[in-house]
Amino acid sequence: MKTHQFSTALFSDYKQGDSFNFPCPAKLNLFLYINGRRTDGYHELQTLFQFLDYGDWLSIKVRNDGKIRLTPEIPDLKTEDNLIYRAAKLLQQKTACRLGADLHLDKVLPMGGGVGGGSSNAATALVALNYLWKTGLSVNELAELGLKLGADVPIFVHGKAAFAEGVGEKITYCEPPEKWYAVIKPNVSISTAKVFSEPDLTRDTKKKPLEQLLQQEYTNDCEKVVRKLYPEVEELLRWLVKYAPSRLTGSGACVFAEFADEQSAQTVFNLKSKQFSGFVAQGLNVSPLHKMLEQLNRQNHG
């Protein structure tokens, strides 16, 4: 695909021959609070998700023989363990669908960056194949399947900016301002498990109602520990916060700064050290994937 900024894609980009191209948008955790640890080891959270107008493309061509093929292969990851492949298989099994698919991922989002790349890929596979295979599952049924693949997958399946509580299963749709963000990835790989097992991690932030959380300054309880464990993140945030409110997304490694307009975000992004990667994108309260499906449905019923 020519662009990874979905709003600039033409409707003709969505369908090429027998293949459909579906967006897999990034996300940010605009805030993230850890309220406690359960007996099963999971952490209770309160977090606000917003999508970004930027991400991967998943191309899908339906097959009649039931086979699932996924390209390109990711080094050190078996295809059967890939979330996209697992999503397709789950949907096949759940619906007894006899169709298959050739899937190709055009990837730009960093793996393990805290921007939801793998979860977004899995959700797009579920939502898009449900549409192409005509398997007829509701959004809630797809979200339930998605939860088997990862805690963040249901948010992408629902396709609306949302406040999530508990271990991520309680979802309230939300409409935070659609600001512009400079998203930057330091050259470190962060283990979520390591962050959440760290003794110094704040685990007792008091639960608050959403209305109150939206009014106060947004922060991320993982950030203090990540800054301590990874000096590159500390250094990057110390630089970025000089220009705009900045923080970690998820458990990292990506950090982001928020701006009122694209030009301000791009100006600061251009000042970053060349050793860091990243992108500039606007926050979106409706996923580009769901906007595309609306267009396809309108065209089909038009």
Curated annotation (Swiss-Prot):
Question: For this chain's UniProt record, which GO biological process terms are given?
Answer: isopentenyl diphosphate biosynthetic process, methylerythritol 4-phosphate pathway; terpenoid biosynthetic process
According to its UniProt record, which reaction does this protein catalyse? Answer: 4-CDP-2-C-methyl-D-erythritol + ATP = 4-CDP-2-C-methyl-D-erythritol 2-phosphate + ADP + H(+)
Protein origin, superkingdom: Bacteria
One GO molecular function term? Answer: ATP binding
Per the UniProt entry, the Enzyme Commission number(s) are 2.7.1.148
The entry's active site is 27, 152
The family database entries (InterPro entries) matched by this protein are listed as: GHMP_kinase_C_dom, GHMP_kinase_C_sf, GHMP_kinase_N_dom, IspE, Ribosomal_Su5_D2-typ_SF, Ribsml_uS5_D2-typ_fold_subgr
Instruction: Identify the Gene3D superfamilies for this entry.
Output: 3.30.230.10, GHMP kinase, C-terminal domain
Its pathway, per UniProt, is: Isoprenoid biosynthesis; isopentenyl diphosphate biosynthesis via DXP pathway; isopentenyl diphosphate from 1-deoxy-D-xylulose 5-phosphate: step 3/6
Could you list this entry's UniProt keywords, alphabetically sorted.
ATP-binding, Isoprene biosynthesis, Kinase, Nucleotide-binding, Transferase
Q: Which family does it belong to?
A: Belongs to the GHMP kinase family. IspE subfamily.
Q: What is this protein called?
A: 4-diphosphocytidyl-2-C-methyl-D-erythritol kinase
Q: Which organism is it from?
A: Mannheimia succiniciproducens (strain KCTC 0769BP / MBEL55E)
Query: Which gene carries the instructions for this protein?
Result: ispE
